[in-house]
Amino acid sequence: MSNIHEHKILILDFGSQYTQLIARRIREIGVYCELWAWDVSEAQIREFNPQGIILAGGPESVTAENSPRAPEYVFNAGVPVLGICYGMQTMSEQLGGKVIQGVGEGEFGYAQVEMLLESALFKGIEDAISPAGRPLLDVWMSHGDKVSAIPEGFKAVAKTDTCPFAAMANEEKRFYGVQFHPEVTHTRQGLRMLEHFAVAICGCGTNWKPSSIIEDAIERIKAQVGDDEVILGLSGGVDSSVVAMLLHRAIGKKLTCVFVDNGLLRLNEAEQVLEMFGDHFGLNIVHVDAENRFLDAMAGVADPEAKRKIIGRVFVEIFDEESKKCANAKWLAQGTIYPDVIESAGSATGKAHVIKSHHNVGGLPDDMEMGLVEPLRELFKDEVRKIGLELGLPYNMLYRHPFPGPGLGVRVLGEVKKEYCDLLRRADAIFIEELHKADLYNKVSQAFTVFLPVRSVGVMGDGRKYDWVVSLRAVETIDFMTAHWAHLPYDFLGRVSNRIINEVDGISRVVYDISGKPPATIEWE
């Protein structure tokens, strides 16, 4: 079995919104990497023993007092270094170059850089040719400051009209700096540049791929738990489903999955989870039908935060009860993924991401005397999905839209009642079914229906009815931090509205939410 961690890249984070994207791109190439705070010690870097180091971007100005700097050891470790945006600027400044503050000359968005010299980083890469016969590259810029003088031993490799050092290189030391962002898709051949760095320049093998990650995870699970039994809270979501499949492959019947049906799931979701994991894959599943228990606990409660806390508390109570029945279980499995492990603004300076100990299951009892098994701890969400496909999980389950942890508990506004949940489930299923039929489901980032606790008058035949209102919500987003409402076709919305009003007895009106984020959030509660 190939060692998936044998070759690795270390990414030092200075606070850029794009830093996780760099890590995902390096992983995509097939190379393992980790994302650390910029203020790490020499001892930590030595212990990690990377084949190369990337200095990522950041919002600070290198010219400001006390702005972040790369550890000096980075430039003495004898490995290639790539500085991106702020990373290039701090590299330049620390090695004897100069950086000046941008005064109205920053570059933001699309830019074309002109190559001045050949470099190992850009070998064979060009998007166009200049009138002077030089290669041009389409890139994405996002900087105010710029390098005004490069350090000794470096050469200018690329420029723009306003940035004389858009890229620089010291080929002998294998130090490279780019003022643009190769990790974003707008930099047309950015992935090739990162591949040149990680594979050709750093000499990394490309062992980081789904099949190898699965093999490695299974071996590690076996080594960790031995012959012990393991318990897992299976929700039917992506992370817990992939953990279940990995553990099943590793330890078979020694895994017990606890599936708690809280009555707040999507239409037929409980049946689908039980059929797929129990009947089809043969996992050992304990099914707890707790709908009444959850609804009783939320009776009379309208505040969204209070509802979330109740749902979390009742889940923990039930999971604790069920885990005590599995007296031989020595390990608790969780679907913690790599972004859970990266926490903002907690380094020594408060200006970078740091690694933290993270427990993914909301508030599990502190007195649970079990070891923790987290087989997805090193993986990004897109990697988890690819592994799920490799393990045989269906595409439409792995790539469906996000669903909140409290489920319909935060999509029924105000007090949650069984009647409201049943109406919402059916209306939402129609909306999602029609999105699939119209080939629109994968064109929006998230779509769902919200139950509004208001009655509206409607006309059915010769009679009038006074029934409930639902709102359809669909958004387009890259990172879920900001979002635009999706401009779905009017005839499509009309079709969905007609079906819901005609097929779901109890709903008299359908509205469409046209709020962006900000100012609105994606979920209503």
Swiss-Prot record:
**What CDD domains does UniProt report for this protein, alphabetically?**
GATase1_GMP_Synthase, GMP_synthase_C
Give the Enzyme Commission number. Answer: 6.3.5.2
Per UniProt, residues of the Glutamine amidotransferase type-1 domain are: 8-207
Q: Which residues form the active site?
A: 85, 181, 183
The enzyme's main class, written as a single word, is ligase
Q: Which Pfam families match?
A: GATase, GMP_synt_C, NAD_synthase
Q: Which PROSITE patterns match?
A: GATASE_TYPE_1, GMPS_ATP_PPASE
A GO MF annotation of the entry reads:
ATP binding
Pathway(s) it belongs to: Purine metabolism; GMP biosynthesis; GMP from XMP (L-Gln route): step 1/1
Residues reported in the UniProt entry to bind ATP: 235-241
Any one GO CC term of this protein is: cytosol
Domain called GMPS ATP-PPase: residue spans: 208-400
Keyword tags? ATP-binding, Glutamine amidotransferase, GMP biosynthesis, Ligase, Nucleotide-binding, Purine biosynthesis
Catalytic reaction list: XMP + L-glutamine + ATP + H2O = GMP + L-glutamate + AMP + diphosphate + 2 H(+)
Q: Which NCBIfam families match?
A: guaA_Cterm, guaA_Nterm, PRK00074.1
- What PANTHER family has UniProt attached to this entry? GMP SYNTHASE [GLUTAMINE-HYDROLYZING] (PTHR11922:SF2), GMP SYNTHASE-RELATED (PTHR11922)
Main function: Catalyzes the synthesis of GMP from XMP.
Q: Subunit structure, briefly?
A: Homodimer.
Q: Identify this protein by name.
A: GMP synthase [glutamine-hydrolyzing]
Q: Which organism is it from?
A: Shewanella denitrificans (strain OS217 / ATCC BAA-1090 / DSM 15013)
Give the gene name: guaA
